[in-house]
């Protein structure tokens, strides 16, 4: 499938998404599969979380648009999903949800040799981030934290 065809299909699907206060985050057409797979990742225009009902409501109108466009002249499987969870923790909700999970903290300490810390997310306040490193709580001033990401521990 060429780029123009994919672009046309994405434009048509954006119109349908708009009717449901959604937008197309990405559209992938996997032509190396049989039948081909049309993967649509949607997100809400107001930044709320996508529910299974949102995906379900979008499904039939998306099928109609694809079928009526005649851009795909073969059988296909349609997959509609949300973006999922980002590894990077940014919102207060993220920090509450993932308390106790392993995190990688990227530091902004210019004069220090330590650029990353790994531990369990313990607490976040407006002034500091606390992580549990091998049973000891380390408080890091938030102005020294560049990024906090979920990770996996390998002991």
UniProtKB/Swiss-Prot annotation:
Pfam families: RimP_N. Keywords: Cytoplasm, Ribosome biogenesis. Coiled coil: none annotated. It is found in: Cytoplasm. SUPFAM superfamilies: YhbC-like, C-terminal domain (SSF74942), YhbC-like, N-terminal domain (SSF75420). GO terms for cellular component: cytosol. GO terms for biological process: ribosomal small subunit assembly; translation. The keyword GTP-binding does not apply. InterPro entries: Ribosome_maturation_RimP, RimP_C_sf, RimP_N, RimP_N_sf. Belongs to the RimP family. Required for maturation of 30S ribosomal subunits. This is Ribosome maturation factor RimP. It comes from Prochlorococcus marinus subsp. pastoris (strain CCMP1986 / NIES-2087 / MED4).
